[in-house]
Design a protein with these regions (language model features):
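C-terminal transmembrane helical hairpin of 12-TM major facilitator-type secondary transporters
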Residues: 45-94
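Helix-to-coil boundary motifs at intracellular loop junctions of multi-pass secondary transporters
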Residues: 9-13, 43-44, 94-101, 132
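Hydrophobic/aromatic end-of-helix segments at the C-terminal termini of transmembrane alpha-helices
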Residues: 2-10, 91, 95, 125
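Helix-to-loop junctions at the C-terminal end of transmembrane segments
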Residues: 33-46, 130
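Multi-pass alpha-helical transporter architecture, strongest
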Residues: 141-165
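A late C-terminal transmembrane helix in Major Facilitator Superfamily
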Residues: 98-135, 143
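Extracytoplasmic gate region of multi-pass secondary transporters
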Residues: 1-34
Length: 165
């Protein structure tokens, strides 16, 4: 959702010159997240704190986008790209960690259904918030709320213990 609203938001705040850099930051920020999660996968697996940290990073980045200017917007969008990528990777790793081997396909299907539904509805809600209030910053409220929701729900993740290892 962030990449959909950043260009218009920056235009509305008189920061059009930062659009290209901000969108690049969103994409470039994804790369270190992928490499870090790969490098530390064994240390992050079955832990709750990575989800909480990523949720907090999402909220911090969203606040930075909304209240920052210039290079701070670039830093915030890069952080948002990092957090969003890390969240996606962590969530995609959940089905085999949450379910018995014979249920992985069902849990995966459910998670993809829920995650793609959210990926569609959050931008709609964000656009609606902006349209109804006429305040550009409100478009980012649903995005920040997703980060807060992740922080709240992360402790409820109940991993299935490993057997036979």
């Amino acid at each position: 959702a962030t990449n959909a609203f950043v260009p218009d938001y920056l235009r509305s705040t008189g920061q059009s010159e930062w659009i290209g850099a901000a969108l690049s930051g969103l994409n470039v920020g994804q790369l270190p997240a992928s490499f870090l999660l790969l490098a530390f996968a064994d240390h992050l697996e079955r832990k709750t704190w990575p989800y909480i940290v990523c949720g907090l990073l999402c909220v911090i980045a969203t606040v930075g986008i909304v209240f920052g200017a210039g290079v701070w917007v670039l830093a915030a969008t890069t952080l948002q790209g990092f957090a969003a990528s890390a969240i996606l990777i962590l969530v995609l790793a959940l089905p085999p960690l949450l379910s018995r081997p014979d249920d992985v396909h069902r849990v995966t299907a459910a998670m993809f259904t829920i995650s793609y539904s959210c990926a569609v509805i959050v931008p709609v809600i964000s656009g609606l918030a902006w349209d109804l209030t006429g305040v550009a910053k409100t478009a980012f409220l649903p995005i920040a709320l997703c980060g807060i929701l992740l922080v709240i729900l992360a402790p409820a993740i109940n991993h299935i213990p490993r057997t036979g290892s």
